[in-house]
């Protein structure tokens, strides 16, 4: 059983906890926010909100999976590339959320799939400067079969999701490369029993 790590100094106001779908972010994200006694927001909630408030014509990237006939026939690489467009479509809104928390000095963890290193690397968010107050850490699972096993354990009623696991593995590789390019830490998702303390150390 994992022991809760001792509190370390928090030097950020907004922390982006990113990583591909199926690598284990959700389970550890809430524990990470609890450790630092800060709020946490799922970026997927913003995605659902935007999908309900827009049309496919207004935001094609957000609606592609649900409305495009091409989705069913698309390769894993094509789906991954298209999924990146979701984060790009949401970037302006996420900048506003980050700016608000920086101005109000209300610390927050933002987590989920569509957070990219370049967002945390920005020098400013509108008129609000970063000044090192926005940081990011990315959870990485290098084993495609493990991602497939995670999906099967989480959603056994759907059976093996081989193609979806491939998409997530490709995205995990892309996020790792981008994070390293921007100078943000990449933390291995396993071993699971030490992932919380390793995340805490990476962002403290």
Predicted feature descriptions by range:
Residues 33-44:
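Post-Walker A helix-loop "phosphate-sensing" segment adjacent to the P-loop in P-loop NTPases
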Residues 39, 52-107:
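Conserved nucleotide-sensing/catalytic segment adjacent to the nucleotide-binding pocket
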Residues 21:
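The conserved Walker
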Residues 1-14:
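Extreme N-terminal, non-catalytic leader segments
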Residues 173-204:
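NTP-dependent small-molecule kinase module
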Residues 26:
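Walker A/P-loop
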Residues 130-178:
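A glycine- and Lys/Arg-enriched "phosphate-lid" helix/loop adjacent to the NTP-binding pocket
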Residues 17:
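Hydrophobic anchor at the beta1->P-loop junction of P-loop NTPases
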């Amino acid at each position: 059983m994992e022991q809760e790590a001792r509190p370390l100094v928090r030097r950020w106001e907004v922390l982006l906890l990113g990583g591909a779908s199926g690598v284990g972010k959700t389970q550890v994200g809430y524990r990470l926010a609890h450790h630092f006694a800060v709020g946490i927001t799922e970026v997927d909630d913003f995605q659902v909100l935007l999908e309900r408030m827009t049309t496919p014509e207004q935001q094609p990237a957000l609606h592609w999976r649900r409305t495009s006939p091409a989705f069913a026939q698309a390769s894993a690489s094509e789906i991954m590339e298209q999924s990146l467009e979701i984060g790009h479509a949401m970037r302006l809104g996420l900048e506003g959320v980050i700016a608000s928390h920086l101005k109000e000095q209300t610390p927050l963890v933002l987590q989920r799939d569509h957070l990219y290193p370049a967002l945390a690397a920005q020098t400013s968010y509108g008129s609000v400067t970063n000044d090192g107050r926005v940081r990011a850490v990315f959870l990485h699972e290098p084993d495609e079969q493990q991602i497939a096993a995670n999906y099967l354990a989480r959603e056994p009623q759907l059976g093996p999701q081989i193609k979806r696991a491939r998409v997530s593995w490709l995205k995990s590789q892309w996020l790792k490369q981008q994070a390293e390019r921007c100078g943000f830490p990449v933390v291995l998702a396993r071993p699971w029993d030490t992932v919380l303390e390793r995340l805490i150390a990476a962002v403290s």
